[in-house]
Structure formats: C-alpha cells, structure tokens
Design a protein with these regions (language model features):
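Acidic, glycine-rich A-domain
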Residues: 1, 5, 12-446
Length: 446
C-alpha cells in the first residue's frame, strides 16, 4: 500500500495504552506548594523589587477579573437552570382537579398535573497546562485565562484539579519512581514524564491564593530579566500525547475523590504534541526502546479495557487523533484552549481537520470577536483566542523606545471629548475576556 507521507508501508503495528502509576506520575499540590513557597521566600529577599512588582500585577489582575468571574457564574447558573427545565417531566398525579370537573363532557384530562425537575448533575473540571518551552512567551496570558476559570470554579462550587504536564530531564531525579512499566508494544512513556499538580479545589483559600501569587511571579520571570524562575520546575518539551492518554485514569481518580458525575477536561496548550512512540524490543541492544509510530508501519492504538481501536493518522494532526481516540473511551467533555495570533487561525483550523477554504468564515469571526470556536477537531470544542496586545514582545529589549500599554488608556494629544470617551470604552471592554467564547465554554460545562 501507498501512504501519503511514507511511500512504503510494510504492515500494521498495534499498540496498547499503558497503565500509569498515578502515585508516582502525579506530583501532589502539597509538594509543589512547599517547593514554591521555599523558593518564593528566597526570591522576596534576593529580588524583592521584582517580586513586589509582580505581586502588584497579580493583585491588580485579580481585582479586574471580578467582572469576568461574575459573568461566568451568572451564565453558568442560567444555562444549568435551562438544562434542568429542558429535562423536566410533567405527569398526572391521579388526583382529580376540581377546577376542571365542569369540562368533563369534552375533556378527558381531569387530573392534576405535577412537573418534576430532576436534580442537576455534579460538575467537575480537570485542567492540563502545557509546561513546555514554547509556552514561555504566552504563559502569563494563559495563566490569566486559567485563573479566571479557577475563580469561577470556586465561586460556583465546582471541584477542580490543575496539572502542568512536563518531561523535564530532572523530573526523574526530583520525583523518583516508575510512571509506567515498559511493556512491549505499549505507547512509550518517557521516564521523566510527570503531572505537576499546581492547583486543587482541596486547597484552602489562603494556600490557593499564595500558590497563584507564586506561580504568577514564576511565569512572569520566564521573559522578564528582573526576576528569576524556579529552576526545579523549568519548562520542558510537549508531552501532550502522554498527557492525553492519562485522561481515563486521572478522571477515574478524580470522580472517585469528588463524587462528580459530569467532568469537563480542558487542555491549555500552544499547538501540536511531540512525535509519539511505542515500546519496541531492539535485539542488538537486548532492551526495549521507544520507536516512532511512523515509518514503514501504520500504527493502531487499542484500549485493552474497551477494545476500542483507531488508526493514528499524522496527516490529520497528532493531537487531534489522540484526543478523538480518548473521547471514545471516556465520559467527559474534552475542550481545548489556545492563545494565538490571527495568522495562526488557518494553521490551527488545518490541524483541526477543517478545509482551509472554509476558514473564510473563521477569519470573519476572528475579526469580529478576536476569537473562534472550532468543532470537529477531536475536541468537543476548541477555542482559539487572541493574544493580548500587552503580552510578551520578543523584540522589546531591542527597541527601548517601544512603549508598553499595559493597563493604560492610549490617546493622542488634543483629543476631543468623543475620542476620549471612545478610548475609555475600548479600554474597559478590554478588561473582560471575550464574552462569546466564555458563553460557549460555560454552555459546555453546564
């Protein structure tokens, strides 16, 4: 057979999902908080000015986000109530309605009715945060999105977990243990792969706020020469495939702990996963090594439990293929968030399997809302959102004359009253994340 990317295909390689040791794979929030607390205390004494400046940014953003969080909560309650009403059931009670007795000659329905509205499902949210080097420039904007969603969860009482996925080489030394056994023909898992639990609904309010403060300074330091990030939690590659296939076991653990029925899984990343591998025995080395899933064979992933299997097609995007695979074996909404520029919309649409001709409407929506929501990308919904104008500019240090407009109203000299009014409205509208995307996201959660 001929393959679109590799001309000679000699056979089919069937791979299975590995069984993860969650106790070794997940670094619990008590450990991550302890590490960041010790690191932050040192930063306060060594780089006090930089830390206080970052702390002021965090507190300012938290205050500004009240409007966004309140909007999210209101939308959630409305959509949840609408869903409950939609599932309402009206039935006869068996008791005569005395006010209808006079209609007995032409009306057969003389009984009182009762409408039953079923209890809403318990909701839960699991977030996966891309902790890769390519995220450094957009980590703070992504973190802000995440913080809004965390505060939303706290306000409406939704249990949540936030895991940063990392395969930094020192993880195996800092957090020792075997994550997954090297079983022949299983999807290969790097020995340094870990899920770092940064935030959890099981944190008390003070601990959660402190961790958010520490993390804001840490992420701000990725591109700020005045600060210094935590090297023990440095950015790594993009083990998104490994993260996606942990979802079934992580969700089972989460549902068991929180007793929730409906779970939404959110992947916050900046693009494609690294190339997947499978465990293959190398005779010359007498050892199992990870081998690329592409080459002279077509790979099929099989879930031993459900027996569901799917061919992995690189031409349709690695991330999309694995997300679509997992969506068939878990009972959850799988959602993706991506901060990107306008030029990346077409690229992301192609990764989503959308014909590039059809991106005309996406471009129009982007121009109008600075965001688009895509379906049919493996995810239940994939959200592409514009990078804030105040996000990291890699050329800032080369152009000292460039002005930063963070939290500033920019107007020209001698502006008219109407120009000042419009500038103020534009500034205030920018304080709130796009309502269209928020409404769609809340609709999925509710």
């Amino acid at each position: 057979r001929r393959h679109t990317r590799y001309p000679l295909v000699t056979g089919v390689q069937t791979c299975a999902l590995p069984i993860f040791n969650l106790d070794k794979m997940i670094v619990p929030f008590r450990r991550t908080y302890s590490d960041f607390e010790a690191w932050a205390n040192n930063q306060k004494s060594v780089l006090q000015e930089a830390y206080l400046k970052s702390l002021d940014k965090y507190r300012t953003y938290k205050k500004e986000s009240i409007k966004t969080v309140n909007y999210l909560a209101k939308e959630f309650e409305c959509k949840k109530a609408a869903d409950q009403y939609h599932r309402a059931n009206t039935a006869n009670t068996g008791v005569l309605d005395t006010q209808k007795l006079h209609t007995f000659k032409w009306n057969e329905d003389l009984f009182k009715k009762v409408t039953t509205i079923p209890d809403g499902k318990n909701h839960g949210l699991v977030f996966y945060l891309d902790w890769s080097g390519s995220m450094s420039q957009s980590m703070v904007p992504t973190l802000k999105q995440l913080y809004d969603l965390i505060w939303f969860c706290k306000k409406v009482g939704i249990p949540f977990r936030v895991y940063a996925f990392s395969d930094a080489s020192h993880n195996d030394h800092l957090f020792p243990g075997v994550v997954a056994a090297e079983k022949l023909n299983d999807v290969h898992i790097d020995r340094s792969f870990r899920l770092l639990e940064f935030f959890s609904s099981r944190m008390n309010a003070q601990t959660l706020d402190k961790m958010m403060e520490y993390m804001y300074y840490n992420c701000d330091s990725f591109h700020n020469s005045n600060g210094s990030y935590n090297y023990e939690y440095s950015l790594s590659g993009t083990p998104l495939v490994e993260t996606i296939i942990t979802t079934p076991q992580v969700l089972n653990k989460f549902k068991s702990e929180e007793k929730v029925q409906k779970v939404n899984v959110v992947y916050l990343s900046d693009g494609e996963a690294c190339h997947p591998q499978y465990n293959k025995f190398i005779t010359s080395m007498n050892k199992i090594y990870g081998q690329p899933m592409y080459g002279d064979r077509i790979c099929v992933i099989r879930d031993p439990k459900s027996r569901y299997q799917r061919k992995i097609d690189l031409d349709k995007g690695i991330t999309n293929a694995f997300v679509e695979y997992i969506s068939n074996i878990v009972d959850a909404n799988l959602l993706g968030f991506r901060l990107c520029s306008k030029s990346e919309v077409r690229l992301q649409a192609s990764f989503a399997g959308i014909d590039t001709i059809g991106t005309v409407d996406l471009n129009r929506e982007w121009e109008k809302n600075k965001s688009v929501a895509i379906k049919g990308a493996g995810f239940d919904e994939l959200y592409l959102m514009a990078l804030p104008k105040t996000s990291y500019n890699p050329y800032r240090y080369w152009n000292p004359q460039e002005k930063q407009t963070d939290n500033e109203i920019v107007v020209k000299d001698n502006s008219s009253k109407s120009q000042l009014t419009n500038a103020f409205k534009k500034h205030m509208n920018g304080k709130m994340i796009n309502k269209t995307i928020l409404s769609k996201f809340v609709g999925q959660v509710a």
